[in-house]
Amino acid sequence: MFTSSQTRAPWAPTSIILLVVYLGGTAPLLALGGGTPLRLVALAARIGAVFLLLRLASRRRQGIDGYVERILVDWAPLILVPALYGELPLLMEGLAGTVRYHDPAIARLEYSIFGSQPAFQWAGRWPSRALSELLHACYASYYALIYVPPLLLYLGMTAPGPRLGRGTDAFQDTVLAVQVSFLVCFLAFVFFPVQGPRYFGVPQGVPDGPVRRLVLALLEAGSSRGAAFPSSHVAVATTQFVMVVRYQPRLGLLVFLISLGLAAGAVYGGFHYAVDALAGVAVGTLAVPLAGALRRRLEPSGPDFTSPPGPA
């Protein structure tokens, strides 16, 4: 057992260590898929990101980083989420060559649990345009759920108690838990790709509306095929709810209702199987204690790596 004087401080925040490990560990999958220009660009960008993160972490540790550098280190795990999500098909192909999707297995599991296929039936059972638009709006709120709760903590606007802002554990813990939730989902997508019901037709009777059309446009522009199980939408929403209850309790009911609508909308809109949503709840819930265990392991001395409030 180490005393505080014997404990070695980590070289970077846990979130940065985890990000570097993920980038380095999955890099071979980009190389294994062949030497196409897109893969080479993605691999070069990944190598560059690792070196940049290591450089920023080194400057942070030496206390010579600037204000913008601190912000980059604080937010890098969430800033890189869209890029990491977008490259998932390349990782899937690097692992298996021709990607084999596991939708038949998930559909069988779905039927064994529910005795039906909710993703194809819920909209026809409750064909309300108002309900449809509400659930699709909740589904679209996923993007705000990723960034708004951490931002409020970062600005010191919502955390209870006297210690607010970037110097608190609340921001670090929230970012790390969300990051763990994402990375668990991403690894599941790579090793067990599932397309989701959206690729097998529109749910019968689903009402049309501007919000649904917006969601469809977002998915068409930015979704990665094979990234359905578990639902990262539901996983991240669940993680954010748990962290909001812990650190921003005034937002708890709002985030709970949005998350509930998001999970229902994922199935109602035909974007996910119901078991995708259930698996997302499980991942999102387990991500919180897993993130805590990682931080205790990698930051045993409990240093404060996030930026102090105010300019450098």
Q: What role is predicted for each listed range?
A:
Residues L131-L145, S224-V245, A274, L278:
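Membrane-interface loop-to-helix entry segments
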Residues G196-F200, A228, G261-A287:
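Interfacial helix-loop-helix junctions of multi-pass membrane proteins
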Residues F2-G48, I64-Y147, P309:
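N-terminal transmembrane-helix/juxtamembrane module of multi-pass inner/ER membrane proteins
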Residues V20-L30, A83-E87, F182-F189, S259-Y268:
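Aromatic-anchored segments of alpha-helical transmembrane domains
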Residues V148-L155, V234-G252, A282-A293:
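Membrane-interfacial alpha-helical segments at the cytosolic side of multi-pass membrane proteins
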Residues L187-Y247:
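Membrane-interfacial catalytic/cofactor-binding modules of polytopic membrane enzymes
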Residues V73-P77, Y147-F191:
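Interfacial segments of alpha-helical transmembrane regions
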Residues E87-P104, R108, S181-V206:
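Transmembrane alpha-helix/helix-exit interface in multi-pass inner-membrane proteins
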